[in-house]
């Protein structure tokens, strides 16, 4: 089966189960299974997929359909332009949280202009996305 056909099949399975962003998820999962970038997939749409990789892809599509977040399958979440390792033991960093980081940085900048000392404490908060981003 060709890469483009596998992506289409994954997209259709996700769509049938009312999962939004089905094309994006199908591409991300296939790139993850193959260990390549999403750009690679676009360039190699006509390449054949091995049976083993196809099975892994289908298993991951089923995990998504059964409610497992994409980030827990790929163990990755982008946050503030950085990639963070995530698994079931941590919360997935959310885009809304980026607003908190941006506001904190603005306030810290104002304090630094006044030569104030700044201390930020972030303990046991999961992936460390907030503290690392600050």
Where are the model-predicted features located?
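Generic cytosolic/nucleocytoplasmic N-terminal low-complexity/intrinsically disordered segments
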Residues: 1-2, 37, 55, 109, ...
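Conserved AdoMet
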Residues: 32-107
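Conserved SAM/SAH cofactor-binding pocket of Class I
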Residues: 99-134
């Amino acid at each position: 089966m060709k890469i483009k056909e596998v992506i289409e099949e994954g997209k259709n399975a996700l769509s049938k189960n009312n999962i939004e962003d089905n094309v994006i998820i199908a591409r991300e999962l296939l790139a993850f299974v193959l260990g390549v970038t999403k750009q690679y997939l676009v360039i190699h749409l006509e390449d054949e997929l091995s049976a083993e990789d196809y099975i892994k892809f289908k298993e991951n599509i089923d995990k998504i359909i059964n409610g497992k977040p994409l980030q827990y399958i790929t163990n990755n979440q982008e946050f503030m332009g950085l990639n963070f390792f995530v698994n079931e033991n941590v919360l997935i960093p959310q885009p809304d949280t980026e607003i908190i980081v941006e506001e904190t940085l603005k306030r810290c900048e104002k304090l630094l202009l006044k030569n104030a000392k700044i201390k930020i404490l972030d303990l046991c908060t999961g992936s460390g996305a907030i503290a690392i981003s600050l």
